[in-house]
């Protein structure tokens, strides 16, 4: 019996050590996240570059969807929520509609969406970058304006995706300094 108790203790210790190793790996990936961010943003910009011309030629509107108040929310105390809501907005509302307007660019849009999902996953894993609860009025305004534009909203939102990437970058620079 003492031998089996010792065996159980060793198994328990091995399990604890393995779970500690997992936490360390997660903590390590969060420690390295800021260094990898420029690469992730470059990948987002490159993926967007593959569809940008299509949406620029289709966007016939002079107004701006992603305006200065959105950037201010990204830089302010609502930055976390603005980022989270905008990622969700692009993934759930804009990109699925965009695929319908340009089947020839569907593969590139899927790639862009996957890169955005990867960024969201990494932000959520590293809680200090995305710990939020409040709603952003600027994001609500973007969504409202998008819906008012109907079919043209997709072209406008996708044409301004680079502005969204710049907002992500501004938010992350602020978070990395704090």
Curated annotation (Swiss-Prot):
The keyword Signal applies. The keyword Secreted applies. It is found in: Secreted. GO terms for cellular component: extracellular space. Glycans are attached at residues 67, 134. Disulfide bonds join 30-126, 80-132. InterPro entries: 4_helix_cytokine-like_core, IL-10, IL-10/19/20/24/26, IL-10_CS. It comes from the Eukaryota. Homodimer. Interacts with IL10RA and IL10RB. This is Interleukin-10. The gene is IL10.
């Amino acid at each position: 019996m003492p031998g089996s108790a010792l065996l159980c203790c060793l198994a328990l210790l091995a399990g604890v050590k393995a779970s500690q190793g997992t936490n360390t790996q997660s903590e390590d990936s969060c420690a390295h996240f800021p260094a990898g961010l420029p690469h992730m943003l470059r990948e987002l910009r490159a993926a967007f570059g593959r569809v940008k011309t299509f949406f620029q030629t289709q966007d016939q509107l002079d107004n701006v969807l992603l305006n200065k108040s959105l950037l201010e929310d990204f830089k302010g105390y609502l930055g976390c929520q603005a980022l989270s809501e905008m990622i969700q907005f692009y993934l759930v509302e804009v990109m699925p509609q965009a695929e319908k307007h340009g089947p020839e660019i569907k593969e590139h849009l899927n790639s862009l969406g996957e890169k955005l999902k990867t960024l969201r996953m990494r932000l959520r894993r590293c809680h200090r970058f995305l710990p939020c609860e409040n709603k952003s009025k600027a994001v609500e305004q973007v969504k409202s304006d998008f819906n008012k534009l109907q079919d043209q909203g997709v072209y406008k939102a996708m044409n301004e995706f680079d502005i969204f990437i710049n907002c992500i970058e501004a938010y992350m620079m602020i978070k990395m300094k704090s």
